Swiss-Prot record:
Species: Arabidopsis thaliana
EC numbers, comma separated: 3.4.19.5
Gene3D superfamilies to which the protein is assigned, alphabetical: (Glycosyl)asparaginase
Protein name: Probable isoaspartyl peptidase/L-asparaginase 2
SUPFAM superfamilies per record: N-terminal nucleophile aminohydrolases (Ntn hydrolases)
Keywords, comma-separated and alphabetical: Autocatalytic cleavage, Hydrolase, Protease
Amino acid sequence: MGGWAIAVHGGAGIDPNLPAERQEEAKQLLTRCLNLGIIALRSNVSAIDVVELVIRELETDPLFNSGRGSALTEKGTVEMEASIMDGTKRRCGAVSGITTVKNPISLARLVMDKSPHSYLAFSGAEDFARKQGVEIVDNEYFVTDDNVGMLKLAKEANSILFDYRIPPMGCAGAAATDSPIQMNGLPISIYAPETVGCVVVDGKGHCAAGTSTGGLMNKMMGRIGDSPLIGAGTYASEFCGVSCTGEGEAIIRATLARDVSAVMEYKGLNLQEAVDYVIKHRLDEGFAGLIAVSNKGEVVCGFNSNGMFRGCATEDGFMEVAIWE
């Protein structure tokens, strides 16, 4: 074993015109969450507990697309989703259609620990949350002024805004200047919210992963993306822990997170090789990114977009927070 390691993400694919202050806000939040996880890992907190702890922090801050600050549905409401997985015995929990639970990642954890099921959704998940006594808030708590403005403009453009920030061309040349939609005089993509995730391997070599999101801006009611789908947006095994972000439908088709573990197990690839392989061969024309840790203490961030909000740290003192390639 190579010691503990942790990685966090706040979405893949970033507008090259993103203002410096927005970049700095994202870096500060990722740094704060990394440090929270590092302190816990140094105190021998388990991988699964660290994943939940860090994602709760991300859900509480409105900067990214999870918990407070989640993307809005076509009706202006929030329907959140999250999943968490413990690689030790491949235990998992997931939730979708969450409208009043302050921290969806903790409800996903309770589904794993306190229910006979792996996945609960909509009214059933909300009923379970109340029986478990989790913190409940009004749906309005999750709605921010920025997202209200984004939804209005998305409706005017008759479009759905994806949870990545650049047009499908995926290069700096296809920057926000190509978008006709603006808010406050700036390209709409500057305000686009992003999915969050965390992966951890603890000092015992146990891997865990979690992902949380509000989904797509102006999405249809009832839409479910990759984030709560075990094997697509989230996966953990005895080999690794993986959390994905980007074009949800492409990630679902690729079962991207599970594939990292599969090629490690069946092809004998190391973590870097496995991440490179799935990013290159499994996404077709989709754009996505992922963070991953291995049971050997390795940490890798991979993406085929121009950037990804990300941060990682290892027990030997390495720490990095970055956005661009």
